[in-house]
């Protein structure tokens, strides 16, 4: 019997929800080499300044950081290489059409290990926020926090 995975590793892109309005969310598999998955299980990764793009009908994630595995030998991976994402053909076509429209992009939202031990990347079709939208988001968050404080008293 297989041993259960102890904890669900989760790496979030905190800037994505602040900088973008998320229109649609997908969960994609990600092609990794051995030392990359070992490093991710230790929680050594980052999604800062990461984005997705299409190349020859395939979806790739660019600038995703996965730290080199500490116990890796000369076979260790490159920390910021482009990695292929795995989605259904129907989802790929839908995303490609949507990303070609003006003002939309595909951004990674979070990276996690599922119950089967596979690395998954949650991506979102997003539209950039204007500066005043960001200010409104901050004000709304502060107002919600103050209301919660008042209710606790």
UniProtKB/Swiss-Prot annotation:
GO terms for cellular component: cytosol. Pfam families: SmpB. The keyword Chloroplast does not apply. GO terms for biological process: trans-translation. Transmembrane segments: none annotated. Keywords: Cytoplasm, RNA-binding. One of its GO terms (molecular function) is RNA binding. It comes from the Bacteria. It is found in: Cytoplasm. Belongs to the SmpB family. Required for rescue of stalled ribosomes mediated by trans-translation. Binds to transfer-messenger RNA (tmRNA), required for stable association of tmRNA with ribosomes. tmRNA and SmpB together mimic tRNA shape, replacing the anticodon stem-loop with SmpB. tmRNA is encoded by the ssrA gene; the 2 termini fold to resemble tRNA(Ala) and it encodes a 'tag peptide', a short internal open reading frame. During trans-translation Ala-aminoacylated tmRNA acts like a tRNA, entering the A-site of stalled ribosomes, displacing the stalled mRNA. This is SsrA-binding protein. It comes from Porphyromonas gingivalis (strain ATCC BAA-308 / W83). The gene is smpB.
């Amino acid at each position: 019997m297989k041993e259960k995975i102890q904890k669900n590793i989760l790496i979030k892109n905190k800037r994505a929800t602040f900088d973008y309005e998320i229109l649609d969310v997908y969960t994609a598999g990600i092609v990794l080499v051995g030392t990359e998955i070992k490093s991710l299980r230790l929680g050594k990764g980052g999604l800062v300044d990461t984005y997705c793009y299409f190349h020859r009908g395939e979806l790739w994630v660019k600038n995703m950081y996965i730290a080199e595995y500490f116990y890796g030998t000369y076979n260790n991976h490159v920390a910021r290489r482009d990695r292929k994402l795995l989605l259904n053909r129907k989802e790929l076509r839908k995303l490609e059409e949507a990303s070609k429209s003006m003002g939309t992009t595909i951004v990674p939202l979070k990276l996690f290990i599922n119950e089967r031990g596979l690395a998954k990347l949650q991506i979102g079709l997003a539209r950039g926020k204007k500066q005043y939208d960001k200010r409104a988001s901050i004000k709304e968050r502060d107002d919600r926090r103050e209301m919660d404080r008042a209710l606790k008293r």
